[in-house]
Amino acid sequence: MTDIVDELKWRGLFAQSTDEDALRKALADGPVTFYCGFDPTAPSLHVGHLVQVLTVRRLQQAGHRPLALVGGATGQIGDPRPTAERTLNSPETVAGWVERLRGQIEPFLSFEGENAAVMVNNLDWTEGLSAIEFLRDIGKHFRVNKMLTKDSVARRLESSEGISYTEFSYQLLQAMDFLQLYRRYGCTMQQGGSDQWGNLTAGLDLLHRLEPDASVHAYATPLMTKADGTKFGKTEGGAVWLDPEMTTPYAFYQFWLNVDDRDISTYMRILSFRSRAELEELERQTEERPQARAAQRALAEELTTLVHGAGQTAAVIAASKALFGQGELAELDEATLAAALSELPHVRVAEPAPVVDLFAEVGLVASKSAARRTVKEGGAYVNNAKVTGEDAVPAKEDLLHGRWLVLRRGKKNLAAVEITGA
């Protein structure tokens, strides 16, 4: 088996674990059956989940057997957040989200061979459990004073919101998952984020009590952070989702393309499957020519392909180039163009209007007089064609797919106009 621990550490994917020597030996002797859980608290995974999803993939490629758990039971409860109670979703809603998340996780894993992945749902062993059975068989083995010390619980107890018994009990449900997976599949390792460490160790404690001969482990990845202090995975428009209907492939690609130079080396190591030599070369290029954004482009292309497929990546790259004058906008299919333009400032008008009016209305300039100056200075473009006259009005035949105009001021300032009455 591949000794994966050093690789995980080099990539910045190793925050903490139970006895590291024992874990290292188990992974070296392998294969280890391990699990990672994903709660369906929304209809899609977001980019923050990629750390876990891709680490599961990485461990499977090293020869280990993954159990990907989508929490049809725990998703109805919700892991305690630092600030407030979660909104409870109906069982029907959660069940629908379980299927959506399964569909997003499955393409990252292999379901063939000796270490074939298995998708599991903790509702299978929780739904038929009575309250009496749960309290006698699971709750009996936990001590409240220890449960109160878990970070997720302690933070809530210090807040004015407090914590409900429902969310307080979440760690018991997650602990039961580890017990069930050990008994059903021989699972001996649990993987999660470092913010889940209290829940991971709760599972270990339960196994040690009920299966004292079991040799089991827990391993946590660090949380993704940003150099500017803002939350990873968020934009002005909200979370960056893996579902293409919630975040377009174009917006997904642009999210990675716009990663801060201070963060890109860290993100590349954590998320990319490129070799050390390739990553070190990209780090060197970033240091020497940060304006080229070679590492950002490489990561954006790799992750967009993993999540959305090579075809979507090619379309997104073509759209990105065309928007900035390095390709033909007219050659983009309507769906790709519309997705790209949806991420830009845009206005809707009934008929084509003078270019200076459109530039001012969409906010590319502060006023019509500023728009005229931009035209005079040669910095105004419509569909990548330079505007040469202050009184220019786009013709209907100029509209992309019969309804779109792409406005650009200078090299980087873009906006879109949709003509509704064309």
From Swiss-Prot:
Keywords carried by this UniProt record: Aminoacyl-tRNA synthetase, ATP-binding, Cytoplasm, Ligase, Nucleotide-binding, Protein biosynthesis, RNA-binding
Sites where the protein binds ATP: K234
EC code(s) of this entry: 6.1.1.1
Residues holding L-tyrosine: Y35, Y170, Q174
Record-linked InterPro entries: aa-tRNA-synth_I_CS (IPR001412), aa-tRNA-synth_Ic (IPR002305), Rossmann-like_a/b/a_fold (IPR014729), S4_RNA-bd_sf (IPR036986), SYY-like_C (IPR054608), Tyr-tRNA-ligase (IPR002307), Tyr-tRNA-ligase_bac-type (IPR024088), Tyr-tRNA-ligase_bac_1 (IPR024107)
Location of the motif 'KMSKS' region: 231-235
Motif ('HIGH' region): 40-49
One of the protein's GO biological processes: tyrosyl-tRNA aminoacylation
Subcellular location: Cytoplasm
Gene Ontology molecular functions: ATP binding; RNA binding; tyrosine-tRNA ligase activity
Protein name: Tyrosine--tRNA ligase
Origin species: Streptomyces coelicolor (strain ATCC BAA-471 / A3(2) / M145)
Gene: tyrS
